[in-house]
């Protein structure tokens, strides 16, 4: 099996791990109520999706 010849420094390890960052979720604006919502999903504020009421929100 392959074995590393030298120990990886803390700096090299940190530089490699710097690419592991998370991406922010994309948000779109609901055309009915103007609140931010996840794209391709029902608005949790008003219950509309593609200009139709899908769920009733109290």
UniProtKB/Swiss-Prot annotation:
Origin superkingdom: Bacteria
GO MF, any single term: structural constituent of ribosome
Stated name of the protein: Large ribosomal subunit protein bL32
GO BP annotations, alphabetical order: translation
Pfam families xrefs: Ribosomal_L32p (PF01783)
Keyword Ribosomal protein: yes
Family indicated by similarity: Belongs to the bacterial ribosomal protein bL32 family.
Gene: rpmF
Disulfide partners: none
Native species: Sulfurihydrogenibium sp. (strain YO3AOP1)
Keywords per UniProt: Ribonucleoprotein, Ribosomal protein
One cellular component term from this protein's GO annotations in UniProt: large ribosomal subunit
């Amino acid at each position: 099996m392959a074995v590393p010849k030298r120990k990886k420094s803390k700096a090299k390890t940190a530089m490699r791990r710097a690419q592991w960052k998370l991406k922010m979720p994309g948000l779109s604006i609901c055309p009915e109520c103007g609140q931010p919502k996840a794209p391709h999903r029902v608005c949790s504020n008003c219950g509309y999706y593609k200009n139709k009421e899908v769920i009733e929100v109290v």
